[in-house]
Regions:
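A generic secondary-structure signal marking the coil-to-beta-strand transition
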Residues: 38-40, 62-64, 99
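Short, Lys/Arg-enriched N-terminal segments with co-localized hydrophobic residues
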Residues: 4-20
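Short catalytic-loop micro-motif centered on adjacent basic/acidic residues
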Residues: 39-43, 101-102, 123
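Alpha/beta enzyme core
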Residues: 25-31, 46-72, 77-96, 106-187
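Short N-terminal micro-motifs specific to bacterial/archaeal maturation
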Residues: 19, 40-41, 125, 169
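Generic N-terminal amphipathic, Lys/Arg-enriched alpha-helix
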Residues: 21, 26-40
Length: 187
């Protein structure tokens, strides 16, 4: 949504039909830190995997973060479908443990699609942009996410490996750039 101010973006999102929240990953992780326990984040790719993760989390009485890559979102016909499926399964399965729905390594556009769909956490991977562009997009997304009570991660530099066809060579990130991104208030 390039070129639009934050207030216009928020108005468009809220006019979209509202956002039904699950739980913010930040809220969940803050409680885990205070309680000295870990929270698992599992990327989901289909209904069966999602059901298995939710039922296991419920059985173990453990909060859980359900991660969705852009590729998995496309495979499951879109982020609105994923969010609707998770919310319906949460209700139909009687899940009572906290559940966060997280976009994992999302594009700028993917982050907005997930916000509109009702995700409670986004990870913007702007590491492939020049730093100033990454900073501008990260700043905008942090402001929008926090105004909506969502948690947000932003990436600078890269981690070695491949996901959804994106290859990170594992270069070390510039510590000053990391601090600048962290100072935005990322969660």
């Amino acid at each position: 949504m390039p070129g639009k101010g934050t207030s216009q973006i928020l108005a468009n999102i809220l006019n979209y039909g509202g956002i039904t929240m699950l739980v913010s990953a930040k809220e969940m992780l803050d409680k885990a830190k205070a309680g000295h326990y870990a929270v698992g984040q599992f990327n989901i790719n289909n209904l069966e995997w999602t059901k298995a993760v939710l039922l296991t989390a419920q059985e173990l009485k453990s909060p859980v973060i359900l991660g969705v890559s852009e590729g998995a979102g496309k495979y499951m016909t879109g982020f609105k479908t994923v969010a609707a499926m998770v919310k319906a399964m949460d209700e139909e399965l009687g899940i009572t443990v906290p559940v966060a729905l997280h976009l994992d390594h999302g594009t700028y556009e993917g982050c907005y699609k997930c916000i509109k769909a009702g995700f409670t956490s986004i990870m913007f991977d702007g590491s492939h942009y020049p730093f100033e562009e990454n900073l501008a997009k990260s700043t905008e997304l942090v402001n929008v996410a926090h105004q909506l009570g969502l948690s947000i991660e932003c990436e600078v530099g890269s981690i070695g490996g491949e996901e959804d066809g994106v290859v990170g060579m594992g270069e070390c990130a510039d510590p000053n750039e990391c601090k600048t991104i962290a100072d935005l208030g990322v969660d």
